[in-house]
């Protein structure tokens, strides 16, 4: 596999999630963190939105980060001028390429689409900018028309094409076939932009890289429009462990940036969230916990420390005597077989009542209570 780059769009598509609104300070903090962990490119926002967005972007540009910075634009010269005014040297130009999008936005006049694309690319290239082109709704576009558009964009000076599964309707097999055809026909690299409407954003992004795409759009925690985007932490760790492709990103800080974005967005990370969720390395059931105590690889695909997490062994409804005894021994409590079973029955009952596993403090309190009860 050729080197794949991450172009994170948390500050653009991530913030477009309903109800999310980053402050200037939060956007700067997120950009600095993405850069610090080694993300290659950051889509910093939409300059044409207005003064507040432009202020945030201009301040990020002034940080002189190692990551390349990209502004999102429509195929409108005024948009590109706004990007230039912010100090950006790389622009992304989005244009609809499916029949339904062109019908709604350009009354079906595909010639207008091509003209606007030509004019905007030409202007940006004349200004010495790196130009990325995005085919909005590429996944539903007629394939021959899509190829014609991208070949034209390539001829006019575009440096990259973003294949957008805008409404998240692809599966990995179809994604691979479509992207492979594009890669074979182009000399410029293809970038993947996938949405999670059917829970396949990360899978489709990976399929695109297998087909030859050299860049992937991600967002931290999968934040984004509707069901979200391909999650940065998922794409990075999947490429590392499933495809043995290390991107040079400091994965040990993935939990930190996840928590930063969760706080800034006002959307907590679900416990079962892949890679960074609280339960990702938590073990309760007896069989699993026993295996992990013997060898963590029995029930963990990689070490929790790789993403900044720690392994947690917790007691609850599904726990067994071995796990319970192991946790109690860590607190210098040793029970005989009968006592252990007595406490385990109580743990299971309380777990059902609380609808969760028990904390260590709750377990110790329960042991003290039950021992006192039996002594009476």
Swiss-Prot record:
It comes from Nostoc sp. (strain PCC 7120 / SAG 25.82 / UTEX 2576). Belongs to the alpha-IPM synthase/homocitrate synthase family. PROSITE patterns: AIPM_HOMOCIT_SYNTH_1, AIPM_HOMOCIT_SYNTH_2, PYR_CT. One of its GO terms (molecular function) is homocitrate synthase activity. Keywords: Nitrogen fixation, Transferase. Pfam families: HCS_D2, HMGL-like. One of its GO terms (biological process) is carboxylic acid metabolic process. InterPro entries: AIPM/Hcit_synth_CS, Aldolase_TIM, LeuA/HCS_post-cat, NifV/FrbC, PYR_CT. The keyword Transferase applies. Residues 4-255 form the Pyruvate carboxyltransferase domain. Its EC number is 2.3.3.14. It catalyses: acetyl-CoA + 2-oxoglutarate + H2O = (2R)-homocitrate + CoA + H(+). NCBIfam families: nifV_homocitr. Disulfide bonds: none annotated. This is Homocitrate synthase 2. It comes from the Bacteria. This protein is a Fe-Mo-cofactor biosynthetic component. The keyword Transferase applies. Signal peptide: none annotated.
